[in-house]
């Protein structure tokens, strides 16, 4: 790798289109977390939970918002003031200092097995031991990592990044700039069986497609099944974390986020800009409205028709869930109070010796 470049804060401000507060000639040669940064590093502050690090950080400069810069101006630090998310500006800064890591296998590796009917566009990188099946189509500038498999009649758009050991089975249609992390499987048969007269479970053929829109990202070891007859669709801009299960004929709307270990059962429709928290389970054949947020470990058993934050199992509006959790937390105290009340009632209903007649 080449030596890291050095920029002054003035140069960084021009490149990032931000404002400098402090010494514009401060040299910066790297990026680092705010808690670990040294004088040659630039760091960022986005979440105010970490503002305690700002006072003692050794960073040569910190990227933050205008309101944060005003709040912490008394610290006399070097600030780069951004009008967008500090984290997003910091990401642009990373790209100035850190070179992309490549495998060192440019072009099409000789160990790759490519069917004669497959169509490979220009500037495609195909790493060792990749298999590309008949009538597959790989778009220009796409990168396919070692050991990956592209199934028959599948289409990958331009500028896709397929990491090693990915399986894209037959009948997967992928848009442009899609990223798939290692171990993911797209296009598996759905979990569909029919039980015969002898009680044996017979698998059903799944003939649908998996359709993935532009700018979708799919995490490691995530699985997306194709439908029996209809398609499983992931619309543009959606980001899916690791170890997520998307069942047959699910549709996920644009720009949604699905966090690790969530599971969506068959034929469910997820709206746009939905956030599904980790380990959330969503039953099949329901729909989720746009702009719904499900906190971690939510259990969704019926359709959600209104935007908002939901939690619990079964899912309910978060404020209701929060109140229910508070009541459950107070159950031991409630039980103790109830026991005392029951004892008082028993004492009141039991006559004293003075009240019992001495003669009958």
Curated annotation (Swiss-Prot):
It comes from the Bacteria. It holds the Pfam family LpxD. InterPro entries: Hexapep, LpxD, Trimer_LpxA-like_sf, UDP_GlcNAc_AcTrfase_non-rep. One of its GO terms (biological process) is lipid A biosynthetic process. Its EC number is 2.3.1.191. GO terms for molecular function: N-acyltransferase activity. Signal peptide: none annotated. Gene3D superfamilies: 1.20.5.170, Hexapeptide repeat proteins, MurE/MurF, N-terminal domain. The active site is at residue 248. Pathway: Bacterial outer membrane biogenesis; LPS lipid A biosynthesis. It catalyses: a UDP-3-O-[(3R)-3-hydroxyacyl]-alpha-D-glucosamine + a (3R)-hydroxyacyl-[ACP] = a UDP-2-N,3-O-bis[(3R)-3-hydroxyacyl]-alpha-D-glucosamine + holo-[ACP] + H(+). GO terms for cellular component: membrane. It is an enzyme of class 2 (transferase). Keywords: Acyltransferase, Lipid A biosynthesis, Lipid biosynthesis, Lipid metabolism, Repeat, Transferase. Homotrimer. Catalyzes the N-acylation of UDP-3-O-acylglucosamine using 3-hydroxyacyl-ACP as the acyl donor. Is involved in the biosynthesis of lipid A, a phosphorylated glycolipid that anchors the lipopolysaccharide to the outer membrane of the cell. Belongs to the transferase hexapeptide repeat family. LpxD subfamily. This is UDP-3-O-acylglucosamine N-acyltransferase. It comes from Chlamydia pneumoniae.
């Amino acid at each position: 790798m080449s030596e890291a470049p050095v920029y002054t804060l003035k140069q960084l401000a021009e490149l990032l289109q931000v404002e400098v507060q402090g010494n514009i000639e401060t040299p910066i040669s790297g990026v680092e977390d705010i808690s670990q940064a040294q004088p040659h590093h630039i760091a960022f502050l986005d979440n105010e939970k970490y503002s305690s690090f700002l006072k003692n950080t050794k960073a040569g400069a910190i990227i933050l918002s205008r309101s944060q810069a005003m709040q912490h101006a008394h610290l006399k630090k070097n600030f780069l003031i951004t009008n967008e998310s500090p984290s997003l500006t910091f990401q642009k800064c990373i790209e100035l200092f850190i070179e992309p890591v490549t495998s060192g296998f440019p072009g099409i590796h000789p160990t790759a097995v490519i069917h004669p009917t497959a169509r490979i566009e220009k500037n495609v990188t195909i790493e060792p031991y990749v298999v590309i099946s008949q009538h597959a189509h790989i778009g220009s500038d796409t990168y396919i990592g070692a050991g990956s498999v592209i199934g028959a009649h599948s289409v990958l758009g331009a500028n896709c990044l397929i990491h090693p050991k990915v399986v894209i089975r037959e009948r997967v249609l992928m848009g442009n700039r899609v990223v798939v992390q290692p171990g993911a499987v797209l296009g598996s048969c759905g979990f569909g069986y029919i039980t015969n007269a002898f009680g044996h479970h017979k698998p059903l053929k799944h003939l649908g497609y998996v359709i993935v829109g532009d700018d979708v990202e799919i995490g490691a070891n995530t699985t997306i099944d194709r439908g029996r007859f209809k398609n499983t669709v992931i619309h543009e801009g959606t980001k899916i974390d690791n170890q997520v299960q998307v069942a047959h004929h699910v549709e996920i709307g644009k720009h949604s986020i699905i966090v690790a270990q969530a599971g969506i059962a068959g034929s469910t429709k997820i709206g746009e800009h939905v956030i599904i928290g980790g380990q959330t389970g969503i039953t099949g054949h329901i729909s989720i409205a746009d702009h719904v947020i499900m906190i971690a470990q939510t259990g969704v058993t019926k359709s959600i028709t209104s935007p908002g934050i939901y939690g619990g199992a079964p899912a309910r509006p978060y404020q209701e869930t929060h109140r229910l959790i508070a009541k459950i937390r107070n159950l031991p105290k409630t039980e103790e109070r109830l026991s005392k009340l029951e004892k008082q009632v028993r004492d009141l209903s039991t006559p004293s010796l003075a009240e019992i007649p001495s003669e009958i």
